[in-house]
Amino acid sequence: MKDVLKRVSDVVWELPKDYKDCMRVPGRIYLNEILLDELEPEVLEQIANVACLPGIYKYSIAMPDVHYGYGFAIGGVAAFDQREGVISPGGVGFDINCLTSNSKILTDDGYYIKLEKLKEKLDLHIKIYNTEEGEKSSNILFVSERYADEKIIRIKTESGRVLEGSKDHPVLTLNGYVPMGMLKEGDDVIVYPYEGVEYEEPSDEIILDEDDFAEYDKQIIKYLKDRGLLPLRMDNKNIGIIARLLGFAFGDGSIVKENGDRERLYVAFYGKRETLIKIREDLEKLGIKASRIYSRKREVEIRNAYGDEYTSLCEDNSIKITSKAFALFMHKLGMPIGKKTEQIYKIPEWIKKAPKWVKRNFLAGLFGADGSRAVFKNYTPLPINLTMSKSEELKENILEFLNEIKLLLAEFDIESMIYEIKSLDGRVSYRLAIVGEESIKNFLGRINYEYSGEKKVIGLLAYEYLRRKDIAKEIRKKCIKRAKELYKKGVTVSEMLKMDEFRNEFISKRLIERAVYENLDEDDVRISTKFPKFEEFIEKYGVIGGFVIDKIKEIEEISYDSKLYDVGIVSKEHNFIANSIVVHNCGVRLIRTNLTKEEVQSKIKELIKTLFKNVPSGLGSKGILKFSKSVMDDVLEEGVRWAVKEGYGWKEDLEFIEEHGCLKDADASYVSDKAKERGRVQLGSLGSGNHFLEVQYVEKVFDEEAAEIYGIEENQVVVLVHTGSRGLGHQICTDYLRIMEKAAKNYGIKLPDRQLACAPFESEEGQSYFKAMCCGANYAWANRQMITHWVRESFEEVFKIHAEDLEMNIVYDVAHNIAKKEEHIIDGRKVKVIVHRKGATRAFPPKHEAIPKEYWSVGQPVIIPGDMGTASYLMRGTEIAMKETFGSTAHGAGRKLSRAKALKLWKGKEIQRRLAEMGIVAMSDSKAVMAEEAPEAYKSVDLVADTCHKAGISLKVARMRPLGVIKG
């Protein structure tokens, strides 16, 4: 790595501007020799990529605690011109939680694609889970990747599904999203019971071109070209939609020809309202406008094939597409004009030649229209039927068409039979029936139904039912085989019943007896009466939209030496379906006291327990108080001012918080309801991961003058709070990534990495994100303010002294992940810039107008927290930082090992014991988090602080050591 970098000083390195063609400025990295050896190679690429963004000034900067992140490296700093430059969510903060490269991601077209290949197919719609509607779909926002650690988590469910991923990747359970590393055997997870078919790259063969429409008006061709439907190639991005619309139209659609003064040609679709709504959604994706839904109720007289007559009240629903161009398009694809019962037609040749997943869409559309739904008699599925009727002279055409369907189904390992049924009025009717349990299961799991929500949901549940029925039968088959083996060895039935391998709800004494006494054949085994009937299964395991509950059977750590990937989506649900399983998808404050180490040490256990009780912590932790949605807007726009006004702090607190705890550009109307709801329930909580609350003592003072001004002396007890904007900040980032990506394209910004999605700062999109991000910063400050209030109350509870008398004043509060409007001197002139600090801290010098007057003589306090069991540093800002790093310095120790690797190496109890041996009381909502945050997982905070000090971008004032710590 040193051969790439140019040495500037002992602790400063330059990444040359010619490292990458697109770089507008060099990279500047602050590292000593030891930290340089620990640097991940991918970080150089991220530094270079940031240097390629428009409007960047001087350098793309990396702090001593730098490590790999999303878009920007964590520990990255960059300043962009406010008029010519950009703002990027990736430069503020975002998490990556990952799955293995071979995870199968289900798409809206019913096929799955390996996760590692998904980054090449970002225009796909993927399946997601909506708690109110069930199955939905979403555009892809991004696909991120990172290198894996040695071990990852593999979970296996009772139904045989397997998912592999990092320990921090969330999986949907009945209790919400839980990281894979925190799942337990026996936990229930939500799965989508559909396997689909593997994606196959279509050819670029032309299906239709202008020559097919040469006889028609040029407006027909223009209409289709404008919508990307001419020329129509097999690899058209909407070919799946086109195939399933055509399939449905062969069943419940028609091309109507009206002969009047002016000949009209239009397409009509028929079905239930919900069905037509879904069809209309697909048509919109093609740019085709459909009519409103026409409905009418009428009485019809029905006479069946056996001569019975009856009257029925029914509702007819239909939509029309009045475009003649679309009608001709569907006709050229193979759909007949006029009544289908009077027409000769076959399966279109292009469908026969298409990839399997395209055929799947055609068949799913056809069966969605005319196929019968899954029905059970006790435990057994009845055949799934497709019936066709035509006039007598078209009998051969019916048979030809159904035989073509039969051949298509066979490609999916689905057996079917065709037979004649009774018909009326000189017509002939034939039925194709999918028969046999295995074939029915294959149909439901590989094809299923499209557009008919009722058929689809029942079909999904039926598929899962048959899967689990097979598993139950397999258990009984193995029992029969094993019982025979043991019986031959002299083991009695009574002895077998006591063995663990025979303890299963589907194994009975009678089954074992029949196996050994009656020589029951394995292939003759029937399902146990303990197995639920289909309706009972739905009641017990069904979830809205055809999703089902599955139980984790096994969890293990496995070795994995390839990349891990994650998917971001546009929709608010922020999940996707991998291997059928639904998966998901700050700052620091120093508070001083007038207590000494000796005064606190005797009560440290009680104090930590009290703090743990009073300050909510842990993954998904929620605040103590409940707030209305309207109050959230006040929090987002007022920050700490709101908290103090509501009684959570002292008026003087505002003076010792960066920006007085409120960015004035915040506008809550730019924050989504989803983000607000996530923030509303979490306000006043610590969270999880590297967020913590630590009771410390000042071990050593390096700068007596600055320490005295900050109110710090040796042996004094202080409290460090490290937390941020919780789920709200993450949600804001997610909400704006897609907007920024589109904006980058619209403004002609070439991105070296899609994770650096951005927009010009002064653009509408840039300002919208900035206002929302300011809300996130205000929320984080308010969150730390409320925690400060409960810290003060906890000290009062334990020491029986008022917080005011304990002099529990804020030394300073500074943000870590933020983009801010600032003025800096560049090339001798004052320039307005937007400074991105991602995992970096502001470090303004003496006499800067943005810092408290009390600190003018020494500069802004800088807080660099260490990891559990090690030191933290209080430092001060400098003029060198203003000149070199836009007034920025490091924000902490910086991870050296990922959470997944830390979990592999250490156990939470072990870390807790080691801390106790050092005299540190540690409490956490999760033992896994204790392991993730093991001291060895981080770079040396001493090396980070030394590097900053040597570089002059912040200077040491004091070093603090922990007495007790609370981890989320």
Curated annotation (Swiss-Prot):
The active site is at H891 (gmp-histidine intermediate). Its EC number is 6.5.1.8, 3.1.-.-. Essential for tRNA splicing and maturation. Acts by directly joining spliced tRNA halves to mature-sized tRNAs. Joins RNA with 2',3'-cyclic-phosphate or 3'-phosphate ends to RNA with 5'-hydroxy ends. This is tRNA-splicing ligase RtcB. GMP binds at residues 690-694, 816-817, 865-868, 872, 891-894, 967. Pfam families: Intein_splicing, LAGLIDADG_3, RtcB. Residues 245-414 form the DOD-type homing endonuclease domain. Belongs to the RtcB family. Mn(2+) 2 binds at C586, H722, H816.
